[in-house]
Amino acid sequence: MNTVLVIGDDSDWESYKRFCEQLQKHHSKKLKWITATYDLIEKNELPIIDSDTIIIFLFFPFSYWDKHIEKEGYKGVYGNVEFYNKFRVFWSEIHRTLKKVYHGKKIHFINHPLKIAIDRDKELTKTILSENGINIPIPYYTRDYNDILKLIDRENKKLFLKVRYGSMGKGITYMEKGNWKTNFRFDDGKIVSSTSDYKWTFIDITDNVDFLKEILTKDIVIEEAIDAYKLDDIIFDLRLYVFYDKVLYIFPRTNKKDAITANISQGGHGRTTQFLKRFPKNVIDDATKIAIQTVDNMDINFAGVDVMIDKDLNVYVIELNAFPGFTKVSRFNISKRIIHEIEDMFTHKK
């Protein structure tokens, strides 16, 4: 019997804990399931596994992240390249340790540790997707504040300035003529990051050129806002949970029309799949195909792909998250579905 090793942190209540709770209800005759936490790797106490084949499912390492990357008292700007470099080193060490501990075993990673951090680099992700024919927002590469002012004041462009190596809707600045907003803070000429993962509230910084000059010196990506499909008095996006070549669930997310993002962690609201009936079936079919292609292009097997639909019903990929938060079980039991998918896929695999 093959073994599935699930590794995460107990502080990850949104994904890992929900997955473990589902496993407690699951009685498998197909695979042996074992859970472990990242601190066991640090202590050299990973479980002994007799199976010749091990399937490893990696969740987000919250404890490491909070201790070594976005740590308490950190004074730098959120989402900089230092975050990314440390994260990649962490995963290299995890890969090396797992290969050493389970030497001689055949290991299948759901998401390979050497590939799992790539979604943190928004620039690289969108370059890969664009080269593979997937629609992404129009990028801009200037770091001259005069160019930005020209784009928004003379050409009436609407722009997003996002930290290059961030997630969860943190570190976003939106700019259009007469309306600049950011969920950073700007104090005494310095950009200040929130100390929380949630509720990075937006403030008005319209025409604050000093802020603009400063943010342009940071690790950011600049992209044109999607001219989104108009729907009532709300903004929306869709998160598609992709597992290998299947979309397990489509999660519509909405926010009030003057909001900057529909991200749940920053004030957005989840909708049921009934929401999808507002769109022609071919649009949802396109989103499904594009999400599957996106995950394949990024060489991972499980991710949340965030898409937007423009006024002409074209689908654009906005973000990719290799560690997507799981929806509440009452909405859709993602853990249960993944468990069944893994069992179907790996029961007889050698």
Predicted ranges, named:
Residues 1-5:
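Extreme N-terminal starter segment of soluble prokaryotic enzymes
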Residues 12-14, 34-150:
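Conserved N-proximal alpha/beta basic substrate-recognition cap immediately N-terminal to
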Residues 28-42, 186, 190-191:
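A generic structural motif
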Residues 155-263:
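Phosphate-binding site of ATP-dependent enzymes
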Residues 14-15, 65, 118, 168-171, ...:
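Short catalytic/ligand-binding loop motif for oxyanion handling, primarily in non-cytosolic enzymes
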Residues 239, 306-308:
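Short, surface-exposed charged micro-motifs
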Residues 262-302, 309-350:
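C-terminal active-site "lid" helix and adjoining low-complexity regulatory extension at the edge
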Residues 15-31:
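A short, Lys/Arg-enriched amphipathic alpha-helix followed by its capping loop at the start of a domain
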